[in-house]
């Protein structure tokens, strides 16, 4: 009800200023305004909205809250625009004002959504002020080359994808970046080791697969930790890379490409669109970071290293912690690369991305790292006042024992294996149900449905949790047909698709909607919340709010369909109720799509 709220708030604000002109003028001089505190009603019996500002305004207006409410109501009742939106207001308690929307207002809003691909969600570029919006960068997934994607990458990948989808839906230009770990000491170790055990892999594509590459990396890391000579050789290889040695760069490119192929298989399965821009991209800009921080007077030399001491972030000794920008040996680290990335991303095109907002989706363990990096970027004055950089942290994926999810042998769970298991379990469940119902379906149907449900279950189980907290991973819970799960929502979409097939396409045939049953109005009000939920998720970056809304909408719809006739109703009720079914289906499908979840017509 975002548009209704905006219009209503405008009328209430105007009425408040007209009713109390002296107080309005007084607060305006101090740069403030009389705030009516218009909010969504907390309970259905309080109507649709509540004006809660009378108690706070009493101190300014010098009247009792109830007197203020009575005067404001009188002013509102003389406003024709307000009366077209709301029924006569009611005072509750010491001065709260309850507002209930006119049925005609609700019907007009529902009618407009029936023919609106955006389902009432306003585009940011509809506003003249925001026509020159800068791009938004969402930095997510970011696996390391020569390592397989594991369950820890799941959260960053699907949370980041959902955030990017929602921002794009609102009209922002979104740049999806995969900041892969494609540079550094690990490549020196790996190349040095492969020169001895698999030299062909450094000159020829597809000689080894990623699984073998991971094992080679583990062995290289072990040798690096135990053998000083190997350690020195590895560092020399890193120097060769940094100097642009052709053989070293060829080997590096082959290793990156091998990993990239495997990453893309996962992204294809999850339907993730993302542009790779690894750490190596920012190598040419690292010296610029040093130069900028030196000019700004932020860079300090400490024990041979160049660092910036952070404000308000102290170590155990009570002294400010340093953010190391350049090590004593002249090398750079993650913080330097992240600063170079921020600097590049905020610079205007063509020298950078020209971003107005950068969102980093990583685990909460990196919160302190980003707090330090963001602080330095702000103190260096790289961040314009109109721009934002944000860390979107998330908790751990745990097993049902409450510990970090691991395989039986204690290894980190590979993301590929987790997806395979989800699809396999979904397939077994589908085959069992088909057998119980004595239904015959093609193998292609079973494969498509099991793949869709399996992937959807994994995504939704994660996204439906508050991302800040840890959550316990359970195949049984996520694949259940009851409760706040993907299968439950997918079944609701399938149910509506079946109703629509029987009822026909009504988007163009319903001329005038008319409703009388409480179940209809309850569903209408729930449908109209979609826009405000999307706007809230855009600001708070909490996809679980959208999940909760879709679950509530599906429950409200099921009660509506179970309690009153739809297909067997008399006209015009039949067509009007079918229109609500169709709009509910569209809303559920769009909401699931914004979570990166595909839907089905049949299950």
From Swiss-Prot:
InterPro entries from the xrefs? aa-tRNA-synth_I_CS, Arg-tRNA-ligase, Arg-tRNA-synth_N, Arg-tRNA-synth_N_sf, ArgRS_core, DALR_anticod-bd, Rossmann-like_a/b/a_fold, tRNAsynth_Ia_anticodon-bd
Q: Name one GO biological process term.
A: arginyl-tRNA aminoacylation
**Recorded catalytic activity of this chain's protein:** tRNA(Arg) + L-arginine + ATP = L-arginyl-tRNA(Arg) + AMP + diphosphate
Q: List the disulfide bonds.
A: none
Q: For this protein, what is the EC number?
A: 6.1.1.19
Family statement: Belongs to the class-I aminoacyl-tRNA synthetase family.
Q: List the PANTHER family hit by this protein, alphabetically.
A: ARGININE--TRNA LIGASE, CYTOPLASMIC, ARGINYL-TRNA SYNTHETASE
Subunit = Monomer.
What's the name of the protein?
Arginine--tRNA ligase
Gene expressing this chain: argS
